[in-house]
Curated annotation (Swiss-Prot):
Family affiliation: Belongs to the 4-hydroxybenzoyl-CoA thioesterase family. DHNA-CoA hydrolase subfamily.
Pathway(s) it belongs to: Cofactor biosynthesis; phylloquinone biosynthesis; Quinol/quinone metabolism; 1,4-dihydroxy-2-naphthoate biosynthesis; 1,4-dihydroxy-2-naphthoate from chorismate: step 7/7
Record-given protein name: 1,4-dihydroxy-2-naphthoyl-CoA hydrolase
TM region positions: none
CDD domains xref list: 4HBT
Source organism, top-level taxon: Bacteria
Organism: Parasynechococcus marenigrum (strain WH8102)
């Protein structure tokens, strides 16, 4: 089995278009980067985008379970500039059978530059009622927690 680091430790290149007129990362980019890192993590783990996200090319039908964002936050610790190569560390956590969050830390070398959190809630796509997480996401969460000590 591949180590969780394979899908939980990623890289992000800061592009010119990610920055504002002062050459610093524009604030709204951080949450987009958090979501994109989560998408990449799922893909690296082996979960096809079409099994989680609606509207993917070639998708026969939308997933039965939707995972809307119900909470997010962002903390900016240090300025992030164009051409920075950031290491992204993901820390997913199941909160209950139908809810999870992914904390993202963006590092430049050993310095934490920014942190983000995105929380998702599982709902049936048709009824919009709460439900359990999709099995693939549940397995990703379980595999991501391997080797970590968690409280009961």
């Amino acid at each position: 089995m591949t180590s969780p680091d394979h899908w939980l430790k990623l890289e992000r290149q800061v592009h010119f278009g990610d920055t504002d007129a002062a050459g610093v990362m524009h604030f709204h980019q951080l949450l987009r980067w958090c979501h994109e890192a989560w998408e990449e993590s799922l893909e690296r783990y082996g979960i096809a985008a079409g099994s989680v996200f609606p509207g993917c090319r070639g998708q026969q039908r939308w997933p039965a379970v939707a995972l809307p964002v119900v909470h997010c936050q962002a903390d900016f610790k240090r300025p992030v500039h164009g051409s920075d190569r950031l290491q992204v560390h993901l820390k997913p956590q199941r909160l209950d059978p139908g809810c999870f969050e992914v904390r993202s830390e963006f590092h430049l070398d050993a310095t934490v530059m920014a942190c983000g959190l995105v929380r998702h809630l599982a709902i049936h796509s048709d009824s919009r009622e709460r439900c359990a997480l999709p099995e693939t996401v549940d397995l990703w969460l379980e595999a991501s927690a391997l080797g970590q000590i968690t409280s009961l």
